[in-house]
């Protein structure tokens, strides 16, 4: 699986939701994306659906941390990454954060057959 990046502006925050493998060129593209964004917005990076992060991805996360980002990590892998890299975690997604493909309002996506 490749990297999927979704952004949403909500309540004075830019939420950047990552899904898949946060590696190489995809990670560098996220670095470019966040540096072009309005720095008046709080930056929140949701790592919950990230399955793998390579050294470049870790470097980008540390860069984003230096910009003042906070991180959402709801899985054991994403929590481990936040702990290991000492990324400030805010716990769960904001309740009114839109989750594309959401069918039940609780972040559960319909199964694909």
Question: What residue spans do the PLM features occupy?
Answer:
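STAS-like cytosolic regulatory interaction modules
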Residues: 1-113
């Amino acid at each position: 699986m490749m990297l999927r990046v979704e952004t949403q502006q909500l309540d004075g925050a830019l939420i950047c939701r990552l899904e898949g493998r946060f590696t190489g060129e995809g990670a560098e593209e996220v670095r470019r994306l966040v540096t072009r964004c309005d720095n008046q917005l709080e930056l929140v990076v949701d790592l919950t659906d990230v399955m793998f992060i390579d050294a470049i991805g870790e470097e980008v996360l540390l860069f984003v941390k230096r910009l003042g980002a906070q991180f959402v990590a709801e899985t054991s892998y994403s929590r481990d990454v936040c702990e290991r890299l000492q990324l400030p975690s805010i716990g769960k997604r904001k309740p009114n954060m839109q989750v594309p493909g959401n069918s039940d309002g609780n972040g559960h996506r319909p199964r694909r057959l």
